[in-house]
Amino acid sequence: DIILWGSQLFCKPAGHGMAVPWHQDGQYWPIDPLATVTVRIAVDDSLPENGCMRYIPGSHKPRSVVAHEFVEASNVAIRQQVAELDESLAKDDALYAGQISIHDVYLIHGSSENRSTKRRSDYAIRYMPATSRYVRDPAFPANAYAAKTSQLMNYTWRPLWLLRGTDRAGNDFDIGHGRRAA
């Protein structure tokens, strides 16, 4: 019972790719109950020198979203970060082109700027169990946050695909796919 609910290309150009503050994806996504996984495929080598993803090992185990705070900076890709964090625990998630990593919605992660001469690009694919509901209500906290902070993110119209099994949560698989031919 698996739903594909999103994919995204992340690209940090050589010499100026933005930093991504420490965060948990669950802070932003309209899924209830919150259960999802991201499969990240390295398009380019994703190494410390070009801003690879970093993570806090075990931070997903409490199964809760920790407090995030607003970031007052213009050189970051997202404007929120985990409020309290021991960065000395961080590990690099270095990948070579073609390798993958998988991370949980509760994992605390981020990345530094790309100050190298090489681009860093990853393709992320997001899955959720068909026992969770993708919430399209604009008042749901993740949707309200996206509407307030980004003209590019409108989670209420995102298409879903039931890849396997049975939808057990009443998800709408018609929204976001455009008109169907008669």
PLM regions with names:
Residues 17, 52-53, 65-68, 134-139:
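Short aromatic-enriched loop/helix-cap "lid" or pocket-rim segments at secondary-structure transitions
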Residues 25-36, 88-90, 95, 118-119:
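A short beta-loop-beta micro-motif enriched in histidine and acidic residues
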Residues 1-54:
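Conserved double-stranded beta-helix
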Residues 13, 47, 62, 129-131:
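Feature marks short, surface-exposed loop/turn motifs that line or immediately flank catalytic pockets
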Residues 100, 106-182:
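Non-heme Fe(II)/2-oxoglutarate
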Residues 46-112:
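Double-stranded beta-helix
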Residues 24, 73-89, 119, 137-146:
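Short, surface-exposed loop/helix-turn segments at secondary-structure junctions
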